């Protein structure tokens, strides 16, 4: 009998039931633990936190994809099929993700993005030159400092925590909007964020009672 494999991206819990996403409190602690990091490293972690992007997608971010008027970042969506059903090469897919204005302003403060865009120079040079392993160690270091221990203490845990936060907010983000923001092809993938437990689920039930 053929064994069915499940993509890690599709799970909020490990094989033993361990949580793979950050709770609201853990997300707050992660942000608070960033104070000791270099401004550039701090911004990398802020991008992960506020956009829900994949760590490797953040590493590809370039000045051209920082949108000031829209207060958004543009990411190339990874984990997409590179060929269509007929084997033809597909064009890269991008998505726009709204982020807090303070993040846009801090990116400009550290990298001088407005000036680069005005001069039309260096627009396609990645903001971060660190490797994926270095980025992984950065996130792990901040998690350790924040006292976050477990399989959720990763960049993917941050991404899942973002998804959970969006569906457990007082005004939950519609799944089709969240799917676009996270680069999901199908909203069925995004529905995993409804499988929340603990305080997040209690908050959803409480909101439903109040409604």
Label every PLM stretch briefly.
Residues 79-81, 182-207:
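Catalytic-site neighborhood detector that most strongly recognizes the C-terminal catalytic loop/helix
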Residues 3-28, 83-102:
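DNA breakage-rejoining catalytic core of tyrosine-based enzymes
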Residues 27, 100-150:
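Active-site/catalytic core of tyrosine-dependent DNA strand-transfer enzymes
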Residues 60-109:
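Conserved tyrosine-mediated DNA breakage-rejoining catalytic core shared by Y-recombinases
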Residues 20, 24-55:
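Basic, Lys/Arg- and aromatic-enriched nucleic-acid-binding interface segment
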Residues 159, 206-211:
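Short, basic, alpha-helical segments at the C-terminal edge of helix-turn-helix-like DNA-binding modules
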Residues 34-37, 118-123, 137-180:
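Short, basic (Lys/Arg/His-rich) helix/loop patches that form interaction surfaces
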């Amino acid at each position: 009998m053929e064994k069915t494999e499940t993509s890690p991206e599709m799970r909020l819990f490990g094989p033993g039931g361990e949580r793979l996403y950050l709770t609201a409190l853990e997300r707050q602690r992660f942000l608070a633990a960033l104070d000791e990091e270099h401004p550039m490293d701090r911004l990398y972690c802020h991008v992960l936190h506020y956009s829900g992007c994949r760590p490797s997608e953040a590493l590809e971010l370039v000045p051209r994809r920082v949108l000031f008027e829209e207060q958004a970042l543009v990411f190339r969506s990874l984990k997409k099929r590179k060929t269509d059903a007929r084997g033809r090469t597909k064009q890269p897919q991008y998505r726009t993700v709204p982020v807090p204005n303070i993040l846009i302003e801090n990116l400009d403060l550290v990298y001088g993005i407005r000036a680069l865009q005005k001069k039309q120079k260096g627009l396609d040079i990645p903001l971060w030159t660190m490797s994926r392993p270095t980025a992984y160690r950065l996130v792990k270091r901040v998690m350790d400092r924040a006292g976050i221990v477990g399989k959720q203490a990763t960049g993917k845990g941050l991404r899942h925590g973002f998804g959970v936060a969006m569906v457990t907010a007082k005004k939950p983000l519609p799944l089709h909007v969240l799917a676009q923001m996270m680069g999901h092809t199908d909203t069925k993938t995004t529905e995993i964020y409804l499988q929340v437990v603990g305080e997040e689920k209690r908050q959803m039930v409480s909101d439903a009672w109040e409604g």
